[in-house]
């Protein structure tokens, strides 16, 4: 049986990413820079000769748009199974969805916990803090949030393993991917870039993290695109 490996991609840069707004379950499309970055990623994955058996994304528009670009660059549009899973959505920021990042992460949360920076909080503390300050009642507590993220990625790995292993291409979100890594090895990655790749292996019911936030595929794709422009 082939190794079961998940390639977890953070979606391309969006309008809200660009102006510093918390996206969560709200959604904006990739902008021009974001689209180019994902074309770079798709080319980089193609140049690396990676083969994918299935594709999965959250049901958010920005991950669906990202996946479409990657599959196009890989020549896999309509060629491998691709479905959506709401369990691998981003965290829900409740009444702060669509608000400025600075207001939530550098204002409200530090005041609630009497800390200087939100990175001082564990994911569990951050989730419970969001529940506390969310006036809409939409934010998920840590048990619910971590449970649906674990279940979502586990379902992909189990499906792939049952099919004989191989690689899955998965497009999700920065904090969701970071949370999954934390649940595996209790390390907390910071600032996963748009279009970065985090690789997770699955064997005998256990996950191991092979790499986090790898930008080498995007960088390789960017080089190919630059060379194509120079030769025109």
Q: Where do the language-model regions lie?
A:
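An N-terminal RHG(E/S)-centered segment typical of histidine phosphatases
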Residues: 1-52, 65-72, 76, 206-215, ...
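Acidic, low-complexity terminal tails and accessory targeting/binding regions
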Residues: 2-4, 91-103, 107-113, 158-166, ...
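Beta-strand elements within well-structured catalytic alpha/beta cores of enzymes
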Residues: 5-9, 56, 163-172
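Active-site glycine-centered loops adjacent to acidic/histidine catalytic or metal-binding residues
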Residues: 11, 87, 173
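Phosphate-coordination/substrate-recognition cap region in phosphate-metabolizing enzymes
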Residues: 42-117
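Short glycine/proline- and acidic residue-enriched helix-loop micro-motifs
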Residues: 110-144
């Amino acid at each position: 049986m082939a190794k079961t490996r998940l390639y977890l991609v953070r979606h391309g840069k969006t309008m809200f990413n660009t102006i510093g707004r918390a996206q969560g379950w709200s959604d904006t499309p990739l902008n021009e820079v974001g689209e180019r970055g994902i074309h770079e990623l798709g080319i980089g994955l193609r140049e690396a000769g990676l083969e994918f058996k299935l594709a999965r994304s959250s049901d958010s528009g920005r991950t669906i748009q990202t996946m479409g670009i990657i599959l196009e660059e890989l020549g896999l549009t309509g060629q491998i199974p691709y479905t959506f899973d709401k369990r691998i959505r981003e965290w829900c920021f409740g009444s702060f969805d669509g608000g400025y990042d600075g207001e939530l992460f550098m204002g409200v949360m530090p005041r609630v916990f009497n800390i200087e920076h939100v990175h001082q909080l564990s994911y569990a503390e951050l989730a419970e803090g969001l529940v506390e300050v969310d006036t809409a009642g939409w934010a998920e507590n840590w048990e619910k949030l971590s449970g649906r993220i674990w279940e979502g990625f586990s379902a992909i790995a189990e499906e792939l393993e049952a099919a004989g292993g191989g690689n899955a291409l998965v497009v999700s979100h920065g904090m969701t991917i970071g949370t999954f890594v934390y649940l595996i090895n209790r390390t907390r990655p910071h600032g996963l870039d748009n279009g970065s790749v985090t690789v997770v292996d699955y064997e005998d019911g256990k996950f191991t993290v092979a790499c986090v936030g790898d930008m080498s595929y995007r960088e390789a794709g960017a080089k190919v695109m630059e060379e194509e422009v120079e030769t025109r």
